[in-house]
UniProtKB/Swiss-Prot annotation:
This is Cytochrome c oxidase subunit 1. One of its GO terms (molecular function) is metal ion binding. Mg(2+) binds at residues 368-369. It comes from the Eukaryota. Component of the cytochrome c oxidase, the last enzyme in the mitochondrial electron transport chain which drives oxidative phosphorylation. The respiratory chain contains 3 multisubunit complexes succinate dehydrogenase (complex II, CII), ubiquinol-cytochrome c oxidoreductase (cytochrome b-c1 complex, complex III, CIII) and cytochrome c oxidase (complex IV, CIV), that cooperate to transfer electrons derived from NADH and succinate to molecular oxygen, creating an electrochemical gradient over the inner membrane that drives transmembrane transport and the ATP synthase. It comes from Trichophyton rubrum (Athlete's foot fungus). Fe(II)-heme a binds at residues 62, 378. Keywords: Calcium, Copper, Electron transport, Heme, Iron, Magnesium, Membrane, Metal-binding, Mitochondrion, Mitochondrion inner membrane, Respiratory chain, Translocase, Transmembrane, Transmembrane helix, Transport. GO terms for biological process: electron transport coupled proton transport; mitochondrial electron transport, cytochrome c to oxygen. GO terms for cellular component: mitochondrial inner membrane; respiratory chain complex IV. Its cofactor is heme; Cu cation. It is found in: Mitochondrion inner membrane.
Length: 528
């Protein structure tokens, strides 16, 4: 029965598919909110949204939907669940029923957040939930409380999933798949799960204290009662900075796999890649205050956080140059997945360079809360995490569905989206340099030109999204069955197994049927 299969599923592949379906819905709603923002900012003065509180609620909804309900369920929940048991050669996840509740907690979480946005004036706090804006004086209705409960449920879901992934990778590997032979995507999921496990409880503590400040008369962040509103910024960013690596590290694993497969050679410097991801995970916890240069940290503290922040460029640079070295001398196969992977490398590098600018406290005093910051984190998220997501989608979707798609259409989708997001976000660097502040629904006439270009770019991105849904529809209705490994480079490899032998063991999933059977392995594989 389909009800038992989809509502009571304990199969990692089905749960991964549910995660991917869920992220489609959230991603489309989040994209709609972003287009509303850009339409409002397309010209000076009031365009559509006369109420600034409503504008701020839309910004908050866009951020939380995209982070907690689009990127995380797709990269970690979707691809992680579907592929991880296949990559480690295990029968399923370690705790299948825990896996099920990890997904189903996201539905009430999303509903709570939707209610938070539509009850009374909505939660117009930004995703950072800073008091006093998030406190009872400024948001007197239940909206922020509902948003906090929604974040709690989402956090519990992610924590349960993280425990499951860690246990699966440590305990469920087939004979011979040592950790040093684990596929890079497996490593990425492991490091992401550890980051989730360490950072989410801090967020839970922070928003619980905010909840009691709002409703039970405590004064954790209330200056009049002896609290400190800066305290929640430290707590939030101690979670928030690892969170941005939680969003991007699974993308690193996907990009490594895709570039390796489409260059017909092993990843350059496998161990270096693994230790670079580990370093990024560890370093993510030691420079959270670079988000807080403007709150009055003393000069020694700022000097430390500048130095710590700039060190992250080393492991990130190792990864970028290893990807380039993987391409160099390979037989490049420019599939849609490879185009998105190369787009990721270029855009992520640009985002990293603007990050180097923002890491300097003296410069960040000027750039803090301007569109320069918006451009920076959208280059690493909107073109980093999302391009990685599309890259993984185009690479593995023949495996997930067992159906082929139109490669030319996939390439067209890449170019439309690439032009759209660059038109949207590159001008925002200039707006930030000119001093245009974030989270404000109006602006002086001087900023009109770049804003119009940016808003036009967002429409192009929507066209790309529509085109992608069209590709998916045609794949589901007219796609031909996939029988063999679809990404062979014909002039070099005629045989799948020859190809597998050349590429270590990061392709265990391609040894199976497409789509894999519910019980993928009849007997456990053994890695020699």
């Amino acid at each position: 029965m389909w009800k038992e299969r989809w509502f009571l599923s304990t199969n990692a592949k089905d749960i991964g598919t549910l995660y991917l379906m869920f992220r489609y819905f959230s991603g489309l709603v989040g994209t709609a909110f972003s287009v509303l923002i850009r339409l409002e900012l397309s010209a000076p003065g009031v365009q559509y949204i006369a109420d600034n509180q409503l504008y701020n609620s839309i910004i908050t909804a866009h951020a939380i939907l995209m982070i907690f309900f689009m990127v995380m369920p797709a990269l970690i929940g979707g691809f992680g669940n579907f592929l991880l048991p296949l990559l480690v050669g295990g029968p399923d996840m370690a705790f299948p029923r825990l896996n099920n509740i990890s997904f189903w907690l996201l539905i009430p979480s999303l509903l709570l957040f939707v209610f938070a946005s539509i009850i009374e004036n909505g939660a117009g706090t930004g995703w950072t939930l800073y008091p006093p804006l998030a406190s009872i004086q400024s948001h007197s209705g239940p909206s922020v409380d509902l948003a906090i409960f929604g974040l709690h449920l989402s956090g519990i879901s992610s924590l349960l999933g993280a425990m499951n992934f860690i246990t699966t990778i440590i305990n469920m590997r087939s004979p011979g798949i040592r950790l040093h032979k684990l596929a890079l995507f497996g490593w990425a999921v492991l490091i992401t799960a550890v980051l989730l496990l360490l950072s989410l409880p801090v967020l839970a503590g922070a928003i619980t204290m905010l909840l009691t400040d709002r409703n039970f008369n405590t004064s954790f962040f209330e200056l009049a009662g002896g609290g400190d509103p800066i305290f929640i910024q430290h707590l939030f960013w101690f979670f928030g900075h690892p969170e941005v690596y939680i969003l991007i590290v699974p993308g690193f694993g996907i990009i490594s796999t895709v570039i390796s497969a489409n260059s017909s050679k092993n990843v350059f410097g496998y161990l270096g890649m693994v230790y670079a991801m580990m370093s990024i995970g560890i370093l993510g916890f030691v420079f959270w205050s670079h988000h807080m240069y403007t709150v009055g940290l003393d000069v020694d503290t700022r000097a430390y956080f500048i130095a710590a922040t700039l060190i992250i460029a080393v492991p990130t640079g190792i990864k970028i140059f290893s990807w380039l070295a993987t391409c160099y001398g390979g037989s490049l196969n420019l599939t849609p997945a490879m185009l998105f992977a190369l787009g990721f490398v270029v855009m992520f590098t640009i985002g990293g360079l603007s990050g180097v600018v923002l890491a300097n406290a003296s410069l960040d005093i000027a750039f803090h809360d301007t569109y320069y910051v918006v451009a920076h984190f959208h280059y690493v998220l909107s073109m980093g995490a999302v391009f990685a997501l599309f890259s993984g989608w185009y690479f593995w979707i023949p495996k997930l569905l067992g159906l082929s798609y139109d490669l030319f259409a996939g390439k067209v989708h890449f170019w439309i989206l690439f032009v759209g997001v660059n038109l949207t976000l590159f001008p925002q660097h200039f707006l930030g340099l000119q001093g245009m502040p974030r989270r404000i629904g109006d602006y002086p006439d001087a900023f009109a030109g770049w804003n119009l270009i940016s808003s036009f770019g967002s429409i192009v991105s929507v066209v790309a999204t529509w085109y992608f849904l069209n590709i998916l529809y045609l794949q589901l209705t007219q796609g031909s069955p996939v029988s063999r490994y679809p990404w062979l480079t014909p002039q070099y490899f005629s045989d799948l197994f020859q190809h597998l032998f050349t590429r270590n063991n990061s392709s265990l999933e391609w040894c199976l049927n497409s789509p894999p059977k519910p019980h993928a392995f009849d007997c456990l594989p053994v890695q020699s």
